[in-house]
Amino acid sequence: MTEGMCDDMVDGKYRGWADRVADTLAKASPNFSYVNLAIRGKLLNQVIDNQIPAAVPYISGPETLVSFHAGANDVLRPNYQAEIAFAKYEKGISDLSKTGATLIVFTVVDRVEGNGKTAQLWHERFSAFNVNVRDVAKKYGAIIIEADDAKWLADLRFLAKDRLHLNSDGHWRLSQAVLEKLGKDYDPNWKIPLAPAHKKTWFRKNSENLIWIITFVIPWIWRRIRGRSSGDGRSAKYETPISWK
């Protein structure tokens, strides 16, 4: 999410909510610098073992804002073990907390359309994931961005065609939610939901579902079978601090 997946592209990189937040923060601080170590598809152990150690040298106490959003990719795996993932998540926050940084974490939408087994499993896993995020945030004093406070997130029109990542409008709204939580300038229109969507015909809805399965679900399953990830071979957008204006 923090890489900016499925937002508009700028200079060959997804823009994303974090870049948008950086735009506002930089206006208030002439010495503002920005690092974005997020890489799509990474699991908790990869974030903890690789990204956190890479971030620590650039943290200088509470004036450094660090966002941590990891674990959702673990939840989506068939062999997901909640207790192991929860412990890893807390370790990540614990490691970052020791630096004195100001931490920000996120819950996720724990309900999706439908009443089948997939929707039920999604709710069971992600509702428990959210409870863990809240508990860890409280324990370590992290700022939490609550999906429950942003009902618009349940609207599929804010998701990209993969139905997993935010689209451009979704990233913009999330950036404004974060800025509001931080007490910075923000656009209150982020809270306004879209007008009710027109009801789709049975044919259109099922055609879109079929296209989605062919375009996104099958490739995802094929990567899992081969032990591959969409983030393999990719580097972070901004691995070292850059001046942001």
Which residue stretches match the model-derived regions?
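Structural recognition of the beta-strand scaffold that forms the well-ordered cores
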Residues: S33-A38, T64-H69, L103-T107
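Serine-esterase "nucleophile elbow" of acetyl-processing enzymes
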Residues: M1-A38, I52-P62
